[in-house]
């Protein structure tokens, strides 16, 4: 009887503490819409906020994008602190993702010819404090506004490569869900600036892409 009771208790415990499934992209999107509406209806929406700087910790830097023609200008992405821009070699920084629906950054790439910014959301460092993202964000006005270009269920985007000869051709590496299986992971490619994506590499629903690079003499 004791053995039977112990077995039943172990089974109940296993069920109670089993891994929770990943949050569906549709649920995340609904939450973002609700957040946007709350911000619009907030009684303090017109009050200015002033940055007091890093108080407890400054956050994890996950990526840089440096202007090859002007190396004192660059963007810095933080795991859960958005994207920041400097044009004076870091003497001062300006936040450029305050108007985006998320601050969780995995990687950043910039087309320095026209100023278009691509941000892969979702921190790529795998830990219990890593926040998932909402896909791939794109800004064509240097961060004033952002568009979601898809891959919303990838959760963590690790790499973005822009074809220097054709900025509409972009390759993206996606980690996928950290602690559960999903199919939106691997390598994706667009030839129309992110309107549509084609999966070019998929191993299985448990394997993601941490980093990708391209031959500088042959992007494809």
PLM features per residue range, with description:
Residues 1-22:
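Bacterial Sec-dependent N-terminal signal peptides
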Residues 19-220:
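Beta-propeller blade termini and top-face loops
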């Amino acid at each position: 009887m004791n053995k039977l009771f112990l077995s039943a208790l172990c089974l109940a415990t296993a069920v109670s503490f089993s891994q929770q499934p990943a949050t569906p992209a549709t649920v995340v999107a609904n939450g973002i819409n609700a957040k946007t509406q709350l911000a619009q209806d907030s009684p303090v929406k017109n009050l200015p906020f002033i940055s007091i700087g890093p108080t407890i910790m400054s956050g994890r830097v996950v990526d840089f994008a440096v202007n090859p023609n002007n190396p004192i200008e660059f963007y810095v992405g933080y795991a859960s602190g958005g994207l920041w821009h400097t044009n004076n070699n870091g003497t001062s920084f300006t936040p450029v993702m305050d108007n985006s629906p998320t601050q969780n950054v995995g990687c950043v790439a910039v087309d320095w010819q026209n100023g278009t910014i691509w941000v892969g959301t979702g921190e790529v460092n795998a830990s219990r404090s890593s926040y998932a993202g909402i896909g791939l964000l794109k800004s064509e006005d240097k961060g004033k506004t952002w568009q979601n270009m898809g891959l919303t269920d990838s959760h963590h985007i690790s790499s973005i490569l822009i074809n220097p000869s054709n900025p509409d051709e972009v390759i993206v590496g996606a980690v996928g869900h950290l602690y559960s299986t999903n199919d939106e992971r691997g390598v994706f490619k667009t030839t129309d600036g992110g309107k549509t994506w084609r999966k070019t590499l998929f191993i299985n629903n448990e394997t993601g892409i941490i980093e990708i690079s391209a031959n500088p003499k042959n992007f494809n």
